[in-house]
Amino acid sequence: MADVQERLKKLGASARIGYVLVNFFFSQASIGSRWKTGKGTPRRKMKRAPARSGGDDKKLQQTLKKLNVQPIQAIEEVNMFKSDGNVIHFAAPKVHAAVPANTFAIYGNGEDKELTELVPGILNQLGPDSLASLRKLAESYQNMQKADGDKEADDDDIPDLVAGENFEDKVE
């Protein structure tokens, strides 16, 4: 234990001597000019692009490759009917299919559209569920038209007011 304490004293003494020697060799002016610190030019902030989901796309492509998907040519549009009556519409999509696995991949920009926007062109694509929703839509449209017609009929009962006349005088 005493041996360790002696070594520590020697280390402390040599460190103090080295410190004095450093001050002895370098004057304060030369130390200040050599080790001058400052901000200099600030670091430039990097503008980061948003993270892309490239990893997900690669995994999807690998999985589709395992399923042995084949491209299907000459598909002009794809419509997916949602339960709320709206349609997801893909114009000129890329379609790949793996028929044995019952898997279809559709690539493209999908747009949410209402059924009324696509009605003339998609009547032959509608199944029984979609036809029922189309009937409901037509009924609601007719009800709206009837309600508008009723409002116009009610307007006939109300007399027009002219400036300078009193409403009560017109009613009597």
UniProtKB/Swiss-Prot annotation:
The lineage of its organism: Eukaryota, Fungi, Dikarya, Ascomycota, Pezizomycotina. Part of the nascent polypeptide-associated complex (NAC), consisting of EGD2 and EGD1. NAC associates with ribosomes via EGD1. PANTHER family: TRANSCRIPTION FACTOR BTF3 FAMILY MEMBER. This is Nascent polypeptide-associated complex subunit beta. It comes from the Eukaryota. SMART domains: NAC (SM01407). Keywords: Cytoplasm, Nucleus, Protein transport, Repressor, Transcription, Transcription regulation, Transport. InterPro entries: BTF3, NAC_A/B_dom_sf, Nas_poly-pep-assoc_cplx_dom. Residues 41-50 have a biased composition (Basic residues). One of its GO terms (biological process) is 'de novo' cotranslational protein folding. Pfam families: NAC (PF01849). Residues 36-58, 142-172 are annotated as: Disordered. Belongs to the NAC-beta family. It comes from Pyricularia oryzae (strain 70-15 / ATCC MYA-4617 / FGSC 8958) (Rice blast fungus). Coiled coil: none annotated. The gene is EGD1. One of its GO terms (cellular component) is nucleus. Component of the nascent polypeptide-associated complex (NAC), a dynamic component of the ribosomal exit tunnel, protecting the emerging polypeptides from interaction with other cytoplasmic proteins to ensure appropriate nascent protein targeting. The NAC complex also promotes mitochondrial protein import by enhancing productive ribosome interactions with the outer mitochondrial membrane and blocks the inappropriate interaction of ribosomes translating non-secretory nascent polypeptides with translocation sites in the membrane of the endoplasmic reticulum. GO terms for molecular function: unfolded protein binding. It is found in: Cytoplasm; Nucleus. Residues 54-119 form the NAC-A/B domain.
